[in-house]
Amino acid sequence: MGKDMHRPGQLDQIAAAFDVVLIDCPGREGAVVRAALMVADLVLIPCGASPADAWALQQSLDLIEEARGLRPDLAVRVVITRRRATNLGKNARNDLAACGVPLLGVELAERVAYQLAMGEGRGVTTMTGQPDAVREIRDLADAVDALLTENHDAASSVAHVA
């Protein structure tokens, strides 16, 4: 799909063909991001664990608020990434909670394993000797699955009432 994924109807066709579609978008405004927000059931916003990252998060939050004008039930979670074992990293959850968007219960630590996996062109869950990174990614997948299931069940309940 690439840069042409915002063609009218294209995302709707793909979404209709699969149970789950993951769309990795740039963290800035643009036609691709706007198109993805119009079909998304869940938006995950990765955010580093520093004050500068929290400040940069605001642009994404502004775009999501705009999308919620048309999609008021759009589910959004901030995922803390690159969290270090420092006081700054430990306080990131409280600091980011002030942004007003619910945080996902899973955080991804700053790990060499993620960089190695990317450099090798594979997922960290296929690597040996990286149990902490594998656990984090599996926990992330479980949390996303639970949110999608919760949102699907809520939508089904609304559909049955109507």
Please place each PLM-identified region on the residue numbering.
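P-loop/Walker-type NTP enzyme "switch/lid" segment
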Residues: 1-23, 27, 34, 58, ...
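Structural beta-sheet core signal
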Residues: 23, 45, 78-80
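Inter-motif core of Ras-like GTPase G domains
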Residues: 29-51
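Conserved C-terminal guanine-recognition region of P-loop GTPase G domains, centered on the G4
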Residues: 57-73, 81
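Short, structured loop/turn "capping" segments at alpha-beta junctions
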Residues: 67-76, 86, 103
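Beta-strand-loop-alpha "switch" segments that mediate conformational coupling across diverse proteins
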Residues: 83-84, 94-122
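NTP-binding/hydrolysis catalytic cores, primarily Walker-type P-loop NTPases
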Residues: 124-162
